[in-house]
Amino acid sequence: MLMLCPVVFIALQRVTAGYGMMYSKKWGPSVGNRAGWIMMEAPAFLAMLALWLLSARRWNPAPMVMCLLFLIHYFHRSFIFPLRMRGNSRMPLAIVLMGMTFNVVNAYLIGAWLFYVSPDDRYPASWLTSPLFLLGIVVFIAGMAINIHSDSVIRHLRKPGDTRHYIPRGGMFRFVTSANYLGEFVEWTGYAILTWSLGGLIFALWTFANLAPRARRIHERYLKEFGKEYSCLGRRYILPFLY
């Protein structure tokens, strides 16, 4: 899977996923955005929960804490984020199924490693005070904060019934077009550090490979719609000052 990351990154430079502001009926049957997000994200939450509760290691402090961080993220994405959405946008079922597969596979890779595959002494209780865990959890929390704040900014751009696009401002939007995607990438980079695992690394790289091309598409869309008003802001796509 690690080797597929550059393939996905290159492929998505040419294919635009038809959801959100890029929604297209060409992607086939669709469902409401709220239902789509729940269908796409909740299976990962349930998969990790099952892997945890069925494991003999379920009460080991370090794996349990790392699992809970994963579950907190996916509980928010599955049950809080969708219910706070505004408007009546739709999401193609094809996108829902692809996203569901991506999320469940990553949940399995991480959960299987934490509770079944890793050596019994890989994550002692002292791991929770190790430099890697402490650095990782700071990065993880920072990424989550950026993601949640950026989603809130986007959500409040429109009043009920308004379908126009507006330029998001404030927070990390001062530096990038897709601050919400930046937050998600930072979050999973932190998770890769705090677990120090191949599964965590794969998830972080897959997140970037999936979101970076979309951030570029959104940037191009803003430039087309807003012209100099947007270009003068000097924002990058997803990584401040870099990309």
Where are these regions (language model features)?
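Hydrophobic transmembrane alpha-helices
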Residues: 1-11, 48-52, 59, 102, ...
